[in-house]
Amino acid sequence: MISLKYLLIIFSLLFNSLSSSKDIYLKDLLKKDGIFYEKFSHTPFTGKITGLLEGTFKKGMKYGEFIKYYSDGKILSKINYFENRLNGSWLEYYRNGNLLRKKTFKDDLLEGEYIDYYSFGQILSKRSYVKNKLEGIYKEFYKNGQLHIRKNYKNNILEGEYIVYHEYEFEPVVQIKSKKYYKNGKIEGKFVGFDENGNKIKEGFYKEGKLEGVVFNYNKFGKVLSKIVYEDGLLIEAISYQ
């Protein structure tokens, strides 16, 4: 036969568990030194919050998926935490329900693929992070899906080839609009520009991020239209042949 003392212990444990796991709103919590408390309480909050932001707290820290809503009830974002730190996927949505942004965190730092989307679902840009720093190829796309910009990062700094492409409304053509190079985050060396038919219309040089020497402008037949002379980024002379 279960004793009265044993029943009282069970009841006490159940009551404490229920009271410590109650659902409240974010406005009912206060944050102190990174830990969340209920107002007028000195005990770190454990439980769930409801309303425009839903999620779970354990001992004053965010755990698991937190969902934020627009005022009309549609999902705005889904963010994952572990012990108050961003861990896992971070998803943001347009009001129409389509994905706006997708990224991943590890121990509060961006890690892996990061993608932005147009409101109709097409990819806008794509890049990768390693410990919160951009690393590797970064691509941007026109609304029709054609490649717009292709550049490269090394340890969060632009490095190597930076290419911009023309946009073609109907034809699946990949035509370079401009090409330049980066070294340690600064434009370095030759740059060149092309028209929509692939004709070279501009070329010149950069030195440590500044224009240096002669910049040539051409018409579509290759004839020089003008020469502009730079020194340490400053315009020295401009000559027109038109």
Where are these predicted regions, by residue range?
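Bacterial N-terminal signal peptides
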Residues: 8-16
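Bacterial N-terminal signal peptides that target proteins for export
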Residues: 1-7
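Glycine/tyrosine- and acidic-biased, solvent-exposed loop/turn segments at the edges of beta-strands
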Residues: 16-242
